[in-house]
């Protein structure tokens, strides 16, 4: 979690957020897992906000006319102050940057174009110095001390863009042609060696563990990693929605192309009192040694059809949703057909 940057949700730009932990409708996803639906707000006039703290700063600006609206947001975060309070002392240099933009242009009475963009650049550098941790009980206290050499340097870059062309033939129908691209580049590198001592502590008269009774274990370890991930995803979708009385019919077709380049080279060596662990007596082995080279290109096709019926009663509103989703993945030649149905109830008191 030390490398964790900014969430995709920018509170200054988002109008509504929907989340489902599973069992969602056919219009979302090919797997019955969680889904996050973010709706960006449309500024009604010129607006802006600025905030700053010891952990970072944010700024956003929006502007709107009859045909054109724009919304921009910039965020910067650094959690070095929080990380410096951990048991492992050292130089923490994290920096997380995020820029998002949302543009809409209504070039005809029934046509609208929109563009969503996101740039996220996260850097994390850590040079550990030492770690001193005490644990155990009042009668059996231990102390674990480590001195470090080396550092860790990570970089995570994400670029995302989506263009949508919307057509409104009447007030009940909407068509949308969308294309999006996602690119990520992740690099994790570290070489950190540590020399550690595990000591037994004796209790003083006031009950505090201060006196060192002797070393229980002495050793060293070395962690190494050169991991890189490059992935790009390009998707094109055609979607539609129509309201027929109390029913809302939705459908969609999507083609998605994926390209992944993954390299993993990671190992850890441990030496305790002059013996490499695990000790076999015949060879020097690592605690673990990971090596992987993966290159993958694939195509995905998906389609869905969904109907939502709303029934209002004296007690509240019932929402019945049923649909069918079909998907094909070229990587494993697998076709999945997923029927989905759900019933929800909103009490009348909550509607008001």
Regions found by a protein language model. Give the residues of each.
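Surface-exposed extracellular loop regions of Gram-negative outer-membrane beta-barrel proteins
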Residues: 31, 67-84, 96, 131, ...
